[in-house]
Regions:
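Gly/Pro-rich turn-and-neighbor structural signature
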Residues: 1-74, 203-232
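Short secondary-structure boundary/capping segments
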Residues: 1-3, 44-49, 67-70, 94-101, ...
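Flexible loop/turn segments at secondary-structure boundaries
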Residues: 35-40, 59-62, 69, 85-90, ...
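Conserved, mostly hydrophobic/aromatic
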Residues: 52, 110, 122, 158, ...
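Active-site clefts of carbohydrate-active enzymes
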Residues: 74-98
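Catalytic-core region of carbohydrate-active enzymes that cleave or remodel glycosidic bonds
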Residues: 94-121, 135-143, 269-286
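Extended substrate-binding grooves/exosites of carbohydrate-active enzymes
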Residues: 123-169
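C-terminal non-catalytic alpha-helical accessory regions
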Residues: 153-308
């Protein structure tokens, strides 16, 4: 910590020489990321005029709130938040895995504790995270406008704004559920041992939830006017069906492994199902890349997602 203290002191001396003024008059922030927060928590002192930019845990949960001592800081406090994660142990880049209630909860915790001078959001490639970006921008504009029991209202308004009134209720439900299911287990972190294939029909129940959701998304999509088709595919249909496919790949692979160990010929049925789902994923991604909006968003959904990092 002594070395780090010398580094900050040296930086402030350089700022003072270059700008010809007291460093306390020059806006500065100190990013309290994962590898740095342990020093701060052990008592490392940061000049009072420097903003403290606290970071979440890389998976959308803030690490701390601002106690009263920090709320009085001249430099204030900010938050660095991830809706996209590129790094170990796993990425979270391919598709939205964050629910609106979770976002509202986490940003409200920050806001109510004085972490409100600056919010920086890691949004990755933008396209996969359009929904959480929209919510965060609206919430940042007026945190008091969206209460804890109004997140469903926000989703309906979002759906109505993008697709009209007729199907807003159905679409908001689809979006809420796929992001909730993805939050159970993010696609890039799926594995064959997450949901049990032997206890309480857990794997079967999860498979049924995803299949039902995908069927509903198809049904609503057939009712979409032509003008909304592309938007519906990229904001609703692809996230729902592609997420459902990845989830079922691992659920089917889990049964394949179990049944193979048991010497059951039905293990082959689940092996074929995995192959079918890979084909569906390839076809959907190709459509997104080459057909949707004339290929405007090519490669946006080509991130690795159906092969486990483990």
């Amino acid at each position: 910590m002594a070395v780090l203290s010398d580094v900050i002191k040296g930086q402030r001396e350089i700022l003072g020489r270059v700008h010809g003024k007291d460093p306390a008059e020059i806006p500065q922030l100190w990013a309290v990321f994962t590898e740095v927060q342990r020093y701060y928590d052990k008592g490392f002192k940061v000049p009072d005029d420097v903003m403290l930019l606290f970071c979440d845990n890389n998976w959308g949960y803030i690490r701390r709130v601002g106690p009263w001592q920090e709320q009085r800081r001249k430099g204030g406090m900010g938050l660095y938040y991830h809706v996209d994660m590129n790094g170990g142990p796993w990425n979270d880049r391919w598709i939205n895995t964050t629910t609106i209630p979770k976002l509202r909860e986490q940003f409200n915790l920050a806001y109510q504790s004085g972490i409100d001078d600056l919010w920086v959001v890691n949004v990755g490639d933008l396209k996969p995270k359009e929904l959480p970006i929209d919510f965060i921008m609206r919430y940042a504009w007026n945190p008091d406008a969206i209460q804890a029991d109004e997140t469903d209202d926000y989703l309906r308004q979002w759906a109505q704004q993008n697709f009209g009134e007729a199907h807003a209720e159905a679409i908001s439900g689809l979006v809420a559920r796929y992001s909730k299911y993805n939050l159970w287990r993010k696609p890039e972190v799926q594995s064959t041992n997450i949901f049990s294939v032997v206890n309480h029909c857990e794997a079967d129940r999860v498979t049924d939830l995803w299949r039902t959701l995908a069927h509903e998304a198809d049904s609503v999509g057939q009712l979409m006017p032509q003008a909304y088709k592309d938007a519906y595919y990229q904001l609703v249909l692809y996230p729902v069906k592609a997420s459902a496919g990845v989830a079922e790949i691992y659920l089917a692979a889990a049964k394949n492994r179990l049944y193979a160990r048991q010497g059951r010929v039905t293990a082959n049925d689940y092996a074929r199902r995995v192959e079918e789902l890979y084909t569906v994923d390839t076809v959907m991604t190709a459509y997104y890349n080459k057909v949707l909006a004339g290929g405007k968003w090519e490669k946006m959904m080509s991130d690795i997602h159906s092969v486990s990092y483990t």
